[in-house]
Amino acid sequence: MALNNFLFAQCACYFLAFLFSFVVVVPLSENGHDFRGRCLLFTEGMWLSANLTVQERERFTVQEWGPPAACRFSLLASLLSLLLAAAHAWRTLFFLCKGHEGSFFSAFLNLLVSAFVVFLVFIASTIVSVGFTMWCDTITEKGTVPHSCEELQDIDLELGVDNSAFYDQFAIAQFGLWASWLAWLAITTLAFLKVYHNYRQEDLLDSLIHEKELLLARPSPRTSFQEEKSAVI
C-alpha cells in the first residue's frame, strides 16, 4: 500500500511537470514565430521622436535585440522537461499497475536526472523572468511611459514583428517555468527519499545477513558441553 501511494505521488508530479512544460513550450514557440526568430529577452532600445526638437515619444527603436541563445535555451529546457516528464510518467504508471518496484540503481539514476532537470529549469526560469523584466523596463522606460507593459502589446511598435501578444506569451511562460520547477523539485525530493529508503533497506539486509552468519558460526551450548565432556574423558 505504501509503495502504491509513493508511485502515485511520483506519477502525479510527473504529470504536473509535463502539463506545465507544455504550457511553456507553446507560447515560447509562438513568440519565436511572431518575432521572426528575434529574442525580446534582454533587448535594449528607447523611444525616439520623429521630430527631435519636440519632446514627444512616438516610436520605439531597438538598439540591440536580446541574445537568441536566451530564448532557445528556455525553449529547449522546456522541451527536455516535457519529454522526460512524459517518459517517466509512463514508466511510473507501468510500475504502479504492475505493483513493481525499481532497483536501487534505477532509483539513484532517477535522482540524478531529476536534480539535473531542476537545475536546468531553474536557470531557464531565471533567464525568462529577468530578461522579460528588462524588456518591460526598456519599453516603458521604467514606468515613465503612459502605458504599461501589458498595454503596449496592443500598440504596434513598428519593429517589423508581431508584438500583439508578447506580454501574454511570456507571462504564461514564466508561470509555466516556475510551476514546472516546483514540480521537478517535488520529484527530486521523492527520488531522494526513495534512494534513502532503498539504502536503509540494503543496510538492514546486510546487517541481518551478518547476524545470521554470526549465529551460524557460534556453537550451541549443548555442543559446547559435549565437547567439554569429551575432553574430560
UniProtKB/Swiss-Prot annotation:
Any one GO cellular component localisation term in the record: membrane
Signal peptide: none
Family: Belongs to the TMEM179 family.
Membrane topology summary: Multi-pass membrane protein
Keyword terms, alphabetized: Glycoprotein, Membrane, Transmembrane, Transmembrane helix
Glycosylation sites per record: N51
Chief location category: membrane
Identification of the protein by name: Transmembrane protein 179
Gene: TMEM179
Transmembrane segments: 6-26, 75-95, 104-124, 170-190
Locations listed in the record: Membrane
